[in-house]
Curated annotation (Swiss-Prot):
One of its GO terms (biological process) is gluconeogenesis. Activated by phosphoenolpyruvate (PEP) and by high concentrations of monovalent cations, NH(4)(+) being most effective. Is inhibited by two types of compounds which apparently act on the enzyme at different sites. The first group consists of nucleoside monophosphates (most effective are AMP and dAMP), phosphorylated coenzymes, and denatured DNA and RNA, whose inhibition is competed by PEP. The second group, whose inhibition is not competed by PEP, consists of highly phosphorylated nucleotides (pppGpp and pppApp are most effective), nucleoside di- and triphosphates, and PPi. Its EC number is 3.1.3.11. This is Fructose-1,6-bisphosphatase class 3. It catalyses: beta-D-fructose 1,6-bisphosphate + H2O = beta-D-fructose 6-phosphate + phosphate. Induction: Constitutively expressed. Expressed at a fairly constant level in cells undergoing glycolysis or gluconeogenesis. Optimum pH is 8. Its cofactor is Mn(2+). Pathway: Carbohydrate biosynthesis; gluconeogenesis. It holds the Pfam family FBPase_2. One of its GO terms (molecular function) is fructose 1,6-bisphosphate 1-phosphatase activity. Gene3D superfamilies: 3.60.21.10.
Amino acid sequence: MESKYLDLLAQKYDCEEKVVTEIINLKAILNLPKGTEHFVSDLHGEYQAFQHVLRNGSGRVKEKIRDIFSGVIYDREIDELAALVYYPEDKLKLIKHDFDAKEALNEWYKETIHRMIKLVSYCSSKYTRSKLRKALPAQFAYITEELLYKTEQAGNKEQYYSEIIDQIIELGQADKLITGLAYSVQRLVVDHLHVVGDIYDRGPQPDRIMEELINYHSVDIQWGNHDVLWIGAYSGSKVCLANIIRICARYDNLDIIEDVYGINLRPLLNLAEKYYDDNPAFRPKADENRPEDEIKQITKIHQAIAMIQFKLESPIIKRRPNFNMEERLLLEKIDYDKNEITLNGKTYQLENTCFATINPEQPDQLLEEEAEVIDKLLFSVQHSEKLGRHMNFMMKKGSLYLKYNGNLLIHGCIPVDENGNMETMMIEDKPYAGRELLDVFERFLREAFAHPEETDDLATDMAWYLWTGEYSSLFGKRAMTTFERYFIKEKETHKEKKNPYYYLREDEATCRNILAEFGLNPDHGHIINGHTPVKEIEGEDPIKANGKMIVIDGGFSKAYQSTTGIAGYTLLYNSYGMQLVAHKHFNSKAEVLSTGTDVLTVKRLVDKELERKKVKETNVGEELLQEVAILESLREYRYMK
């Protein structure tokens, strides 16, 4: 088998010189400094804030500009240059508007092109020429390389270089070149992006985030609980679909469903208009300018889909006793005559109820109309071209957890008991815990995605369990109290008891144990965790367990910023070590363009490498070493006999 493989490879490397050249090239790359990793999490559909963090590389762009130009140009010019790199098209329009004379603008173009070339050169210093070429604007790659590789002894060619820039300006190409170089800088300052979960949720533009990620040069995703809800819906889970629409109605984001993904909500609206009225508990958290009649429509839709959701949950709970969720059969615990519910031996009065479609004898039975509506919605979801593209990318680039360069990336938690031992869940009569449990969860999710025509098999039900189950690594609470929050006034019923992981992650021994469970070195590895906002306002530290645990909820969701005191955190990991970056609230692109100010506050060193980390010590390095070994085998097999 191996000889056949090597014979095939020899078609590409058909002489010894080609093999040797590639081995030399790969071994040289292994000794370059590792590229910068950028970690972001909990984007929650907030595209504008997310793409700003992406454009500035969590401060890497301005850091590079300061390295080169600090003390050479004024701080105001540094801010201007940074804004030009972040938003080249918009900034160019503003700058050109300030020039009256063409000669002055042309001088500005010359100076700016020189600065941008310097910046690209500095940002690409640890990359091969081949990798740099891929990052350059394609139409100007040759010209840019000529300007980049100008040497100190280039006196004979000085006029040649000047003429290149003069001609670029004269032929009206300066804007295109500057814009292309700006995007090259953005690409060069970050080698690889990790999105540690929750692209989707309450924010208005998750679709634009997905498009941005699809076009990004190097990215992976660790699924969040909201991401899995969307994957589950696309995979055939009607209850996941009902949850998505309910959340979109609650946060006045039904546009995502209808306008962005082309899913027809008219049948649901007709059902809602027939059975439901206005209800304060279901009014959306809407824009103040939204007309009252639209708010009432959304309120009715919100009730209709919530009741469908509650009804759809019951059959799953009944057919999956291993989910251990019998206490969530809430529709059966209601006294419909008295409008009361008994929970844990205590009776509560229900408020703002909307039980028009419930048969007290069989409370979880869908009306024929409700069943028809959810079937139509599922058909629309599974036939949305755009959603299909986004979900396929999510599955291709995503996983429940990732081991990368010695670190463990995970959105939610590793379910543990009070003593830090991995919790066990029985699935198909077999116990699973820790890494094995997450692996089986992911296997079922991929199986559900591969068979969207199945709507009530174990794999599809497991997608919903990942959203709401006690031992789900994405939920990590005893129960989700959605029903109680709508209908019961007493706040004690709203509490969701968290898995002990969330306080034990402060403990170094627990974190070391988790790293070891995933086959990572506890002395050098870290757990990089999203999902929970860091309440800095109350003194909470995102660096926990003596540096073994780093919590980086990006805080992009405006709703959480009042509880955290800041917008959130991102993480950078380059060849020198790890830096945690705190962000202020992002107001608008216009503010950045006009003032040049950034949303970053402070960077904190998490870990400093004693020696610069090289490519050979990374995941990419492992792959390159395998390639080298194969090429050496080919050389021996084919050319050294």
